[in-house]
Amino acid sequence: MAGVMSVKDFIVATKYKLIRKIGSGSFGDIYVSINVTNGEEVAIKLESNRARHPQLLYESKVYRILQGGVGIPHIRWYGTEREYNVLVMDLLGPSLEDLFNFCSRRFTMKTVLMLADQMIGRIEYVHVKNFIHRDIKPDNFLMGIGRHCNKLFLIDFGLAKKYRDSRTRTHIPYREDKNLTGTARYASINAHLGIEQSRRDDMESLGYVLMYFNRGTLPWQGLKAATKKQKYEKISEKKMTTSVEHLCKGFPAEFPMYLSYTRGLRFDESPDYMYLRQLFRILFRTLNHQYDYTFDWTMLKQKAQQSQSSGVPGTNTTTQGATVPSAGVPAGVAPGGTTPQ
């Protein structure tokens, strides 16, 4: 958008005024914007109408189908403004990747289990609506703001795909000639092998996200290769040769149980979401945790605020060396598409 016009001149649907850019991705740029009629802040995604692979219209249609679900951002408007496709939606808080960095790249078991419960619920809702997400990763889960600050939102449906007919419930056919869609770090083994993705792949990807939060890194991160294709092959090989037991070593048995279950699902099989939620809920109770929405970052932010109010300089922006994530991250700040790790 730089060089085309100034931000202050850009008004969407006669009432949404762009304030500042807060992100960008493969689709274009994201701005915090304000509804000039009531002062409400929203997020706006802009995509050039000359984009080689436009996805914003498709994403807006998926969002429309998902509207009303818990943890699904509300869509305010979609249309074109000047030379841009525009999606106006809820403004959300930081992503789980942002918060993971804020917490020095390690979450406590309590936080992981509280997140797992919400994450399984979000993915189940998308599946009930006949879609698979195909890019489950920490960047695509955002916390809400204000009264929704403890609610987890699932975003970025540019790679989502309808896996069954909404009327006949006929499942898409099994295929083995697919390119990897999504993010290699969290991709299922079958996705690496070129097998058409289905519900099982979203659930397996979530298992890798949870172990990433537990461990801090995954064994297939940081692999070096000359080309993207070779890197994907290395990640795939490492993933296939790392046993579930080794990946989850030192963590409760529920995590290898989760991954073994999801890897064992048939192509068109519906995951038993309640079984998976119960795995983690029972573990949560066994560990004597309280589901009080006190996440790791809640504690850190409270400490930062206390330090600030007590007059300690320099503590309002960082804690443990990480920038305090603030509200004002849009629904959809994470770039879509395939990424190398």
Curated annotation (Swiss-Prot):
Residues 16-284 form the Protein kinase domain. GO terms for biological process: negative regulation of canonical Wnt signaling pathway; positive regulation of proteasomal ubiquitin-dependent protein catabolic process; signal transduction; Wnt signaling pathway; Wnt signaling pathway, regulating spindle positioning. Residues 306-341 are annotated as: Disordered. ATP binds at I22, G23, S24, G25, S26, F27, G28, D29, I30, K45. The active site is at D135 (proton acceptor). Pfam families: Pkinase. Keywords: ATP-binding, Kinase, Nucleotide-binding, Serine/threonine-protein kinase, Transferase. GO terms for cellular component: centrosome; cytoplasm; nucleus. Residues 321-341 have a biased composition (Low complexity). Residues 306-320 have a biased composition (Polar residues). GO terms for molecular function: ATP binding; protein serine kinase activity; protein serine/threonine kinase activity. Its EC number is 2.7.11.1. It catalyses: L-seryl-[protein] + ATP = O-phospho-L-seryl-[protein] + ADP + H(+); L-threonyl-[protein] + ATP = O-phospho-L-threonyl-[protein] + ADP + H(+). Signal peptide: none annotated. It is an enzyme of class 2 (transferase). It comes from the Eukaryota. Belongs to the protein kinase superfamily. CK1 Ser/Thr protein kinase family. Casein kinase I subfamily. This is Casein kinase I isoform alpha.
